[in-house]
UniProtKB/Swiss-Prot annotation:
Domain of life from the UniProt record: Bacteria
GO CC, any one term: DNA-directed RNA polymerase complex
UniProt lineage: Bacteria, Pseudomonadati, Pseudomonadota, Betaproteobacteria, Burkholderiales
Domain comment in the entry: The N-terminal domain is essential for RNAP assembly and basal transcription, whereas the C-terminal domain is involved in interaction with transcriptional regulators and with upstream promoter elements.
Protein's recorded name: DNA-directed RNA polymerase subunit alpha
Entries under SMART domains matching the protein: RPOLD (SM00662)
Gene: rpoA
SUBUNIT field: Homodimer. The RNAP catalytic core consists of 2 alpha, 1 beta, 1 beta' and 1 omega subunit. When a sigma factor is associated with the core the holoenzyme is formed, which can initiate transcription.
């Protein structure tokens, strides 16, 4: 009779595209596929270190709802395009970059002036389009971080020296764009009740899918080491209770789900602004939404499933304090 737990002996990595891979690991004892798969997925989505633009100052712009002469996009669209630029910083936690461009044509990520220790993963990404006589002059602050940090959370009250025209951005630091897992049956000799774990992961190119899984595993091991060295301590009297932390992915706006314009507008008409708002709605509730049909509902369900979420989930302490609508 075997008393030791099986560990995966087969690990396969299938590259599906740039930054996209399927990782297969087997065999696991029954139940361990879901136990480890769900833990890795949550860590991959919330705890990977990445880089994102966090503050922008644009010459001639006072706030994000302004427009610029000679620039086809309004400032809101320009900032959305800027968030799509993938930065990678080497041996530093933040940097302020300059982008200056004049004359008709597209403004690309490669037009940003870079020091030697800053890299662009997608230099051909389009930020804006200039018309004849157009000009764009902006300062971009890029920081290192993890997860998703809404701009309103980053507006610190002690910051009294605010620069006029400084725009604070919602920052999505995570280099992991999508991750899902599935558990299939595996067999070893006469045992047929084993698990095979299949992880489908897509990154933005800052790290490879394999490295993302390695890093997430290290985070889990580091956290579990606390339990391995568990020693009881007496709790202080009258210790105040803390509200459970909210998963950062739930604080993201529904726009981050990249739904069709029709679906996104239907959700906003029902005051569904954040992913945390959306997952608490049931299918029947969404189908009662004007102009949102079965096709849009299926699209929403598929996008949520790719992030390990479903409709009809229950959340405590939602919405969290300070969340803007």
């Amino acid at each position: 009779m075997q008393n030791s737990l099986l560990k995966p002996r087969i690990i396969e990595v299938e590259v599906l595209g740039a930054g996209h891979a399927k990782v297969v690991m087997e065999p696991f004892e029954r139940g361990y596929g879901h136990t480890l798969g769900n833990a890795l997925r949550r860590v991959l989505l919330s705890s990977m270190v990445g880089y994102a633009p966090t503050e922008v100052t644009i010459a001639g712009v006072v706030h994000e709802y302004s427009s610029l002469d000679g620039v086809q996009e309004d400032v809101v669209d320009l900032l959305l395009n800027l968030k799509g630029v993938v930065f990678k910083l080497h041996n530093r936690d933040d940097v302020t970059l300059t982008l200056k461009k004049e004359g008709e044509g597209a403004v690309l990520a490669s037009d940003i002036e870079l020091p030697h220790d800053v890299e662009l993963v997608n230099p051909d990404h389009v930020i804006a389009h200039l018309t004849a006589g157009g000009k764009l002059d902006m300062q971009i602050k890029v920081e290192k971080g993890r997860g998703y940090v809404p701009g309103n959370v980053r507006r610190l009250s002690e910051d009294t020296n605010k620069t006029i025209g400084r725009i604070i951005l919602d920052a999505s630091f995570s280099p992991v764009r999508r991750v899902s897992y599935a558990v299939e049956s595996a067999r070893v000799e006469q045992r047929t009740d084993l698990d095979k774990l299949v992880i489908n992961i897509e990154t933005n190119g800052v790290i490879t899918p394999e490295e993302a899984i390695r890093q997430s595993a290290r985070v889990l091991v580091d956290q579990l080491n606390v339990f391995a060295a568990l020693e009881g301590t007496e709790a202080p009297a009258d210790a105040p209770s803390r509200a459970p932390a909210v998963d950062p992915i739930l604080l993201r706006p529904v726009d981050d789900l990249e739904l069709t314009v029709r679906s996104a507008n239907c959700l906003k008409a029902e005051n569904i602004y954040y992913i945390g708002d959306l997952i608490q709605r049931s299918e029947n509730e969404l189908l009662k939404t004007p102009n949102l049909g079965r096709k849009s509902l299926n699209e929403i369900k598929e996008v949520l499933a790719s992030r390990g979420l479903t409709l009809g989930m229950k959340l405590e302490n939602w919405p969290p304090a300070g969340l803007e609508k």
